[in-house]
From Swiss-Prot:
Organism name: Xanthomonas axonopodis pv. citri (strain 306)
Protein name in the entry: 3-hydroxydecanoyl-[acyl-carrier-protein] dehydratase
Catalytic activity: a (3R)-hydroxyacyl-[ACP] = a (2E)-enoyl-[ACP] + H2O; (3R)-hydroxydecanoyl-[ACP] = (2E)-decenoyl-[ACP] + H2O; (2E)-decenoyl-[ACP] = (3Z)-decenoyl-[ACP]
GO BP field: unsaturated fatty acid biosynthetic process
Protein role: Necessary for the introduction of cis unsaturation into fatty acids. Catalyzes the dehydration of (3R)-3-hydroxydecanoyl-ACP to E-(2)-decenoyl-ACP and then its isomerization to Z-(3)-decenoyl-ACP. Can catalyze the dehydratase reaction for beta-hydroxyacyl-ACPs with saturated chain lengths up to 16:0, being most active on intermediate chain length.
GN (gene name): fabA
Record has Membrane as a keyword: no
Chief site of localization: cytoplasm
Summary of subunit composition and partner proteins: Homodimer.
List of catalytic residues: 70
Pathway this chain belongs to: Lipid metabolism; fatty acid biosynthesis
UniProt EC number: 4.2.1.59, 5.3.3.14
Family affiliation: Belongs to the thioester dehydratase family. FabA subfamily.
Length: 171
């Protein structure tokens, strides 16, 4: 498939099934772990560091699966799901640029949560800025990210790292 600058939910789910890029390339998780509905922008130029950018959105609905279990009587989106979305998008970027293998989160430098996503929210927006891409024996991207709910920044992460592995047997 030709590289695009935007992707719909159906296309993202095709990635989860191995149908968007090469069958042996990296994949996004399937529902319900896919944590965004669309990619509104992806580029290997631009962003805060000039090395690439990914922008994505998640429509918030009160019936999303995590609100029913986290927490009963006090529903809130788990912070780890927003962080995972940032890793998912970083891995998607590596697959999008043609990096071989399967993506795995390798860590991050710093994470801050300064707000929460409640069922009354409407839209989560992810803004990912690529700071480094290594494409040698080790294939890895490093990014900085922000998550906004209804336009307000609530999560930041620095130095998110995702690597691509042609074999995950010894990982």
């Amino acid at each position: 498939m030709t590289r695009q600058s935007t992707y719909s939910r159906d296309q993202l789910l095709a990635s989860a099934r191995g149908e968007l890029f090469a069958p042996d390339s990296g994949r996004l998780p399937n529902d319900p772990m896919l944590m965004f509905d669309r990619i509104t922008e992806i580029s290997n130029t631009g962003g805060a560091h000039g090395k690439g950018v990914i922008r994505a959105e998640l429509d918030i609905r009160p019936d999303l699966w995590f609100f029913g279990c986290h927490f009963i009587g006090d529903p809130v989106m788990p912070g780890c799901l927003g962080l995972d979305a940032m890793w998912q998008l970083t891995g998607f970027f590596l697959t999008w640029i043609g990096a071989p293998g399967r993506g795995r989160a390798l860590g991050c430098g710093e994470v801050k949560f300064t707000g929460q996503v409640l069922p009354s929210a409407r839209l989560v927006r992810y803004e990912i800025d690529v700071s480094r891409v290594i494409n040698r024996k080790l294939v890895m991207a490093q990014t900085d990210a922000r998550m906004l709910v209804d336009g307000r920044e609530i999560y930041t992460a620095k130095d998110l790292r995702v690597g691509m592995f042609t074999s995950t047997e010894n990982f």
